[in-house]
């Protein structure tokens, strides 16, 4: 059974989905400590994203900055296609849709 996501993410789901949509993303998921709800006050936020088409570095960078402003935390963004093969299964298994 998957754990519930951190309250910080739960309280901003609508805004995060809106941001994702505005940058052409078809999917945004949280993984890592925020998905396991074992994050500390210093934890960053890890997002796994997929686009409905090719994703530009500009779009991903702008999303990263907007998400950091919204959440008040450091944010990391990775695409499904960029996941390292050794991490892929774990990340896909623990990631939670927003």
Put a short name on every predicted segment.
Residues 1-27, 35-41, 52-98:
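Catalytic core of pol beta-like nucleotidyltransferases
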Residues 48-50:
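Short hydrophobic/aromatic beta-strand micro-patches
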Residues 30:
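Conserved histidines in hydrophobic membrane contexts and catalytic metal-binding motifs
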């Amino acid at each position: 059974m998957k754990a519930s996501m951190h309250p910080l993410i739960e309280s901003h789901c609508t805004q995060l989905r809106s941001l994702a949509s505005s940058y052409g993303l078809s999917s945004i998921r949280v993984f890592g400590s925020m998905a396991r709800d074992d994050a500390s006050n210093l934890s960053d936020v890890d997002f796994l994203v997929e686009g409905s088409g090719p994703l530009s570095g500009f779009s991903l960078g702008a999303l990263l900055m907007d998400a950091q402003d919204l959440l008040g935390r450091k944010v990391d963004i990775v695409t499904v296609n960029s996941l390292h093969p050794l991490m892929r299964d774990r990340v896909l298994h623990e990631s939670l849709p927003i």
